[in-house]
Structures are given as structure tokens and as C-alpha cells.
Amino acid sequence: MKLILLFSTVLFSFSALNQTQGIAYTAVGKGVATTFVTDYHCLGINTSALGWGTGYSGKHTTLGMTEFGFGVYSDAMNSAKLKKFFGAVKDQAFGTNPTPYDWNAQREAAGDYAQAGVSMFLNLNWFGFAYQNEKLGGIAFNVQENYQWYSKFNQQTTDILFRGKFSSYFDSLQIAVNGDTSMIANSANLSADTLNSVILGSISVPLKLSAITNGSEIRSVWNRYYNFGYGRKIFGKDSVFVVYGGVGGRFIQSMAMFNMESNESGLYMYSSVTPRFNIDYGNVALSNPSTIMQSGNFPKSVGNGYGIDLSLSAILFNKLKIAASINNIGQVVYNRNVYKVNDTLLTQVTVNGLSDYNVTQSINQLLRDGGLLSLQGEEKYVLKNAADFRVGASMDFGKIFTVGVDIVAPFDRSRPGSITNPVFSVGGELRPTKWLCLSAGYFGGGIYKSNIPVGIRFVLKNGAYEFGVSSYDALSFFMNNSNSFSAAMGVARFRF
């Protein structure tokens, strides 16, 4: 299944952001966002900042587009392997066809991913608008595309996903030669000709899926957000103490969702994926009440929902900003191509295993007919949003330097798209001239180790035009043992 083909193609046709900084490339290089973002960048982060104004005299309207970002993180794999993973995703996005992995390469890749947590996100801001006025407050709207992936597999699950019917889990292989079929013992010493004739792998004493996958999980979601928000001053004296409030929300169109966890309590899995990706579910699709077929060139959404944001902030002596917010409280109802798993014995599979380093393709190995999971169709599935709570503060030291801190925590880490644990960050921005902004910071937590974000931003004609580039971790460009690989960019932001 080409789960992120269309979305990735869109992103790379224009050439981030993890949810702690949203789509705001201006905040990525600092590692902090809650008290730094304004205009439409604050949607989903701190809508009360819409009441602060643009920060540029005489300019009330902000427009932006062509802002995007991506990032890949792991608690065990280094940046060289993560770049290899992202390269495989990019090859798929561009439609290039590298040489498929042979059995030895599949075995090596399985070893890399076993017990390794891997997180990836892709974000694109299609369009953003904000109008901010001291008397009326500020309103904002933007359209954002977001893809989130997190996976961690035990050794046996990884082996089956990458090697398919050739996995060491199976003790027998069925081969077809000149129209005749027979069973042979599975062995690491089989010839290439024999391996090419294998049609399925089977086991004489099978295990239940929950036993095979115990300790494994995948949480993935691809959503389109139509965000809106309003923020304004509530009370206070500008030069001493001012309190601002904000409210926001979003309409959510979901293109794909996969939520699986296997532990001592058993195996849990629900999925809903747009038919644009042509997953062959086999006969189970015929009895699924939520089955739909693809028509047209654009992928059909499989779920719709909403999210609500609430925020409060204060500015003291025009220097110290403090803010807290709750974001994305709500849910998405999936009612198309909805499936759940049956915890049955795994006796055989017919899939070949992953053909490259792109682990997101494992969803195809899990869902398709002849794959790892036994499926049952469902009418609908309700998924609570990946909501978060955040607090932040920052201090302005004149017009030259600002420093701040952020803490972002998930409401429920089990929801697809959620950060796994609280993330702490500290960072700042240096403005040596009116047109140049340099930023750096630190963040850690979640599945992330120590990361050093950096960024550079150019602001021309008193904020009339702005562009810049940032990275979530500068060390990844210089050290092979770094645990991340990322970038964010914006090339078209205007104020007037």
C-alpha cells in the first residue's frame, strides 16, 4: 500500500513540524512556540496570541503559504539509518523504483527496526490568513495537512513484516514448480531459485497474533485541518499587566488512520484507510458495512471530526509573556473502510515482505489479504483526538533578544498522532539587525533524546515579507549517531 504516496508527492513537489511547534517554521529553530507564535501560526498552539498584534507597526494582516516541514526520530536508530528510511519514503513519493531488497537485505533491515521506536511527521500549510487589531482582537484561519507515524515492533513481528512468507517464524514453505506444488522445510540455506518459487509460508504449531506481536505498536494518522481562531485582550493596563483569552477550533478530514497496540492484555487494532491506496482486503471487504470504492483522482476521506482549543495568556511590563492552552479536544468518526483485528492463530501468509527500508509500508503487510492480521469489517470507529496541554513563558530583552521555555504534554499518549510523553524545551531568538533573526534551543522528552534546533529568518521591509529555514536538530547534519533528521521552511509570508 502506498500509504503516503500522494501526500508525500505534494510536499516534495514544493521543495515541520512536530506538534510541539505546529506548522510554525518561525518557532521550529527555537524549539519553543507557546509565547512566540502569532497570527495564523498560533492556531492549535495558543490562540490568545491573536490579541497581541502582529508585532510590526501599521501592519494588521498576515498571509502565508508554501510552509512545510518534516522530521524523523528514533530512540534507537541513528541519523544515517533515519535518512535511509526517509530516502525510501521520498523514492516512493517521486515514483522512483530502486532495486528491491533481496532476502539478505530484508533480514538486515528487520534487525535495524527490531525494538526501535520510530516517529515521523510531514506537515504542509496550504494557506494561512490572520487579521489583528488592537480594539477587535485577532482572527485567523489556515488549512493544514498533517501526517504522523509512530511504530515499534518486537523482533518476531519485524521479521515477519520485512521477510513475509520467508520469515523464520514459518517452519515450512510451499513452492510451485511447473504447475506442481509441494512443501519443503524453511531454511536459511535455500537457493535463490527455490526462494523464487515459494508461494506461502506456514507453521505446524501456530501462535496467536497477540503472542506474536506482544510489545509492538503502530499509531498513524493522516489528517487535513481547517483551523480557525479568535483572541483578544480581556482586561489590564498595557504597560503593567494584561490578560488575553483565545478560542479556536477545526474541522477535520481524515484520509487514513491505523491504531494498533499489542501487550499483555491482548491485541487491539482499528484501521480506516482511503481507498485511493488500493489495499486488497480480499473477501472480508464484501461483508464490511463501511466498504467504499475509489472514484476520481483525489483520495476520499474516511472520517470527519472536530477539535476545540482554549487558551489564556498574560503580558507583564511589556516584557514577560506567560501562556497556557488546551488544544484539539474532540474526536473523529471513521465510517469508511473500517476494520478491526481478530486475535486468531497465524498459520500462513503469502506476502513477500517489505521490499525496501520504508517501514510505513508495513500497514500493507498487516491489512492486505494473505497478510499478517485477520480482519473483521466494522460500521464505524470513534477516535479521540491527539489533544495536548501546554504552558510556556518568555522574556524580551529589548528588541535584540528573547528567550523562553515550553512544556507540552499529551492528554492520552495512546491516541494516534500524540506525543508519547511530555516534551520540555528552552530556546530563544537573536535579532542583530532589523532584517535578520537567528534562533537556537534545546528540547527533549517524548521519544526524543537531546535535540538542538536552529533556524534563520529574514524579515524585509519592516515585516512586509518574510522567509526562513529551520531544523529540529542541527546535530543530525554533522553526526551519524544523532537520533533525528528534520527540516522546516517557509518562503511566502506577507504582512500589510
Question: Where in the sequence are the language-model features?
Answer:
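Sec-dependent N-terminal signal peptides
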Residues: 3-14
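Subset of outer-membrane beta-barrel
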Residues: 19-496
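Absolute protein N-terminus
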Residues: 1, 18-19
